[in-house]
């Protein structure tokens, strides 16, 4: 959306795109509690945390909020794995790039040892574990997940060198129940399941979005309630519909988005009535 159209609605940015600033993301109580546990327990003790849920229920928002908060913690190193489906050799290369450790692709033991030494030095100098975020973790091969488990612990599993936050859909939960991954699944210390939101939660998020964007009265109260009632508990669906409404309103130069506009955009077209066949044959 261009600057002219944003000015028409008194907006600093389009509040319904995925690229909204982190401060525009609404942290409800359960999410706040999860972030607090990561910030005050996991990064100091290490281990695995798991974020799981269906698409559109808030996994990406959780990762963004958590990454932003941990990025403000002094002396902590935070990295994110961007290629979760990579094979083991590429997995090591990316870890080396994230944590600044030169790795030899043909000497996995050298990479294993150097990464652990880097993390151990970080722990001893800061008393906190580095953090690794892995989104779409359901795409990771089982051998890579097991290698990550072995990488992150020492002294017969009594000392943890890294904090890992895995995020994925329900396939990740199913994957962690497989026999070869039970040792990893049993080490998940903190779990957070993003659930379908109530209409009240959606309303809180919607109000927060448009207020942070600069125009709390962008939508009529009736339209906001209608959006929340028809979003199926899904934040992504709500924002997609709201974005469509904003684009349509801008095209029509409407100053406020209202319920009438909603029915114009999302009215279900009525199928034409079928004509009844004429009974009887041809007259001779």
Predicted regions and their residues:
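Conserved NTP-binding/hydrolysis module of P-loop NTPases
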Residues: 11-18, 86-105
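AAA+/P-loop NTPase substrate/partner-engagement loops
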Residues: 69-97
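Walker A/P-loop nucleotide-binding motif
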Residues: 44-65
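A short, basic N-terminal segment
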Residues: 1-45, 267, 271-284
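Conserved AAA+ ATPase "SRH/arginine-finger" region at the nucleotide-binding site
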Residues: 81-84, 176, 189-201
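C-terminal alpha-helical "lid" subdomain
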Residues: 3-5, 161, 183, 211-284
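Short regulatory helix/loop adjacent to the ATP-binding pocket of P-loop NTPases
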Residues: 67-70, 172-187, 196
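Mid-core helix/loop region of P-loop NTP-binding domains shared across ATPases and GTPases
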Residues: 6, 87-91, 102-147, 156-160, ...
